[in-house]
Amino acid sequence: MKRLSLSHLTVLDVGPPHLITLAAEAGFRAVGIRLCSPMPGGVAYPLRAGSPALRDTRRLMNAHDVVVSDIEVVRIAADTRIDDYADAFEAGAELGARRVCINIDDSERARVIDRLGALCDLAAPFGLALDVEFMVWRPVARLEDAVSVVKEVHKPNVFVLIDALHLMRSGGTVASVEALDPALIGSVQLCDAPLASPPPSGIVDEARGNRLLPGEGELPLRELLDALPKDVPISAEVPLARETDCMMRASLVRQATERLLRERA
């Protein structure tokens, strides 16, 4: 089985370097790290290349055989300055990350294409690929929106990120994933949820804190996995507000997600 990655949103109350130890003790061998916030004032754990905190993180990674799969979240907004992310990309490369999660909060299409292209160019020397995530409350709301942006940018290191919850809440289907060119899919985030969407006022809260463990809900996760490329990087993004103990939360998430993946295999 490929290394299943622990998405940082699952345990956002824990930052590096302790995040590495927690992930290892919960049975994960890969993690994502939130170096940048997806919103002003949001939670993030910035690391600078060469800093003591980053060296400590690398030391624990080596000690526990845990890799950093990705960094997040680069936010494209009307006031985004591309160079502001250079330090995060350098730190990500030093951590060995290969992918960057991109959120788009700008409805001006031409500006989004220009800035995403510039971010691709900034990321390329660091060996980083950018994965555009779609969410129903953002301008890039649907799978089709993300695909359209990625195709227009037309860079070799930009892809689509498919989050199981966001796919279903935006009206997407497994069939829409099956119809995609698999080369466009950069990574996948798994969780579960009821099939019925909450009211509009509850969509964001569900995504950020009230997801379900794989197998607890009704999302067509097995069918989704069957529609994906076999080698696509997979992370477990399951923030569980009901479970306050971060170690228990991470352990439950790993067990449930690996059970699902074993069934697929």
Where are each of the predicted segments found?
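Alpha-helix N-cap and loop-to-helix initiation/capping positions
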Residues: 45-53, 80-87, 107-114, 138-141, ...
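Short, conserved beta-strand segments within well-ordered enzyme catalytic domains
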Residues: 32, 67-72
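Short amphipathic alpha-helical segments at helix-loop
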Residues: 4, 11, 42, 100-104, ...
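Histidine-acidic metal/acid-base catalytic patches
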Residues: 1-5, 13-30, 58, 62, ...
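Active-site beta-loop-alpha junctions enriched in small/polar residues
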Residues: 7-11, 34-38, 73-76, 104-107, ...
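Glycine-rich, proline-tolerant flexible connector loops at the mouths of alpha/beta enzymes
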Residues: 32-56
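Short, flexible active-site loop motifs that bind/organize anionic cofactors or intermediates
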Residues: 6-9, 44-47, 102, 136, ...
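Active-site acidic/histidine proton-transfer and metal-coordination neighborhood
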Residues: 60-67, 75-159, 169
